[in-house]
Amino acid sequence: MSNNNDLHHPARRDFLTTAGGVGGALAIGASGVASMTLGGPMAMASALATSRYGMGPGLKGPYLDLSTGKGNQLAYARIQGDLDFGKPKYFWFKGYLMGVEPHKKVVDLMGTSGFGVIRLAQGPDGAIRRMCREIIVYTDLRSGEVLDEWKNPLTNEMVKAVHVDNDPFNYLIEEFFPAPPKFGGLNQGPPPPRVPFIMPWYQHGGWAEMEIHIHLAYPNALQPDKWPRESSGPIVQVSEMFAHHVKVEDLQNPKLTTLDYTGTWNRITPWLPWMLMGQRPGFCQYACFMGTTKNLDEILSRPVLDYAEKNYAKYFDAPTEWTEDRSLSSLEHYALRQKPAPVK
């Protein structure tokens, strides 16, 4: 959720960032591989569903060993999309955007709803291509209607709402952590070392759980000299935190080419540029549930879906071809599509 007013992840993005934080070390014990017994599949499922101290046999096999880069690559690819290449998969998120200012209570500002569609394809050298389109729509806290305008309670100014659409947001899923996103060349740095893609997995009974934390700081596409009312400053500081919950039985079932999950997406980001708060101290935080679905009608409200169908029709399907187009966050898209607001 690459909302860099943003960077999906959720990122939606940038799980891809670094192996240095959460996601760079494995929290798996030597719990051993469950073996097939005369009890058959039911006995296998029962054996996998045991855990102690956050560890269990469902993290070691029999299909995927999550202490290896290859095991994590296949697990993450099945969470993100479908290894039956070509099939699309929906993810969704729904929650709130909050405003955080120094020495003041946190304020709920608006609702946030969105979805994306992912299609996987074979990539080079064993990599898996993840091809995605995604949107974020902002809604009124009381009515749930999609915002066209919004009265900022922190400034009492009426502003035009600018929703988020990212097309594409592509990256490779490999046995190693990829390099962080470049965001059109703004996020530069030396290539990181090739670190095995091993995530911090935990097992709680029949559930496997994994978090991804992404922390970024890079030059702002909205520099304050050109965008005085929109810019949070010369450097963008963004963090995203994803939590995924999947059934151990599904995770270790080789017949399943995709995995349903539930979880949360949280994002800390500067004031959204269209809020016109400039470099005022503080920031925004997204707090959302997320998951997968075969039918968006089951999750998202009718006003959100109606708005998406009218304004973002192509976002109900994922890209079918891999492109080398720059995968930009909403902050870079804002700089390309919008004009600076007049200075008051």
Per-range role (PLM):
Residues 1-11, 36-38, 42:
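N-terminal secretory signal peptides
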Residues 11-36:
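N-terminal export leaders
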Residues 31-33, 42-43, 47:
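Cleavable N-terminal signal peptides
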Residues 33-34, 222, 237, 242-244, ...:
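Intrinsically disordered, low-complexity linker/propeptide segments enriched in Ser/Thr/Gly/Pro
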Residues 48-133, 321-343:
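N-terminal segment immediately downstream of the Sec signal-peptide cleavage site
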Residues 99-249:
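Predominantly extracellular/secreted and cell-surface proteins with exposed
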Residues 233, 248-267, 271-272:
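Mature extracytoplasmic/lumenal regions of exported proteins
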Residues 262-344:
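Edge beta-strand at a domain terminus
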